[in-house]
Amino acid sequence: LGNAHKIMGRVLYALAKDYDFNIVSINGGNAANVIAQYNTTEIIADPAQAQAIADAVTGLEQTISSEFAGQEPTLSLNAVSEGETALKAFDADTTAHVIGFLYGAIDGVQCYDRAFPTAVESSLNTGIVETTEDTVKIKFQVRSSVATKLDDMRNKLDLATDLAGASREISGEYPAWSYNADSVIRPKAIELYKEMFGKEPTVETTHGGLECGILFGKKNDLDIISFGPDLTG
């Protein structure tokens, strides 16, 4: 699915190649762990270029929509001119750094689980972009069942942060808990489930934070399984 922040980063990067503008504000997203559905960016540019910028955005909308091949039927890019006005905007360097970071930072699924090829192993999401009085905050959700892969994604974000002359802060963490192909307790639990309920259980991995990861981090020789409820609706 298309992340609105990443799409906006691409649009701004493309526009910056042909037009001079400064960002006034950039905002969007509701939660760090939810793929952003919208991004609203306000820029200030030469009024004489307003129509050309709007036309360029229309062209980018057509290009990006065709790339999704119908998977994002409601994707829409709109450029609205507010006329001549005086606004406080980012300087040229900050504008370039925000665009470069938003467009260049890694996002989405990074790799799948080798034991379960259809299950995501490592991913991250550009969830919230927020402009305050003198700061742009970009919030990510970073997840992996492999601790070293988690570190690798964070290192890449750190690099992008350094290149943008920005700072970063980690708040909250989901310890990794990898699939154990040699688990002793799992086959026993499967057999017990069949005895109790007369059917095969569904055995799968989940791409999310579980308390098991915290326990495993404290004692990594544990053999752990987790049970989840049946969810409907």
Predicted features along the sequence, with ranges:
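Midchain, well-structured core segments that form catalytic/ion-binding scaffolds
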Residues: L1-V142
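C-terminal catalytic subdomain
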Residues: V136-R154
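Short glycine/threonine-rich loop-to-helix capping motif typified by GTGT followed
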Residues: A32-T40, D93, S178-E191, I214-K218
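Redox- and metal-dependent alpha/beta enzyme cores, enriched for Fe-S-associated oxidoreductases
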Residues: T148-S167, A176
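Generic long, charged, amphipathic alpha-helical segments
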Residues: A164-M196
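A structural preference for short, hydrophobic beta-strand core positions in alpha/beta folds
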Residues: S25, L77-S81, R168-G172, V203-T205
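Generic, well-ordered alpha-helical scaffold segments in large soluble proteins
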Residues: V11-A14, A56, L60, K156-A160, ...
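Zn-dependent metallopeptidase/amidohydrolase metal-coordination segment
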Residues: R114, E121-S123, G127-D134, Q141, ...
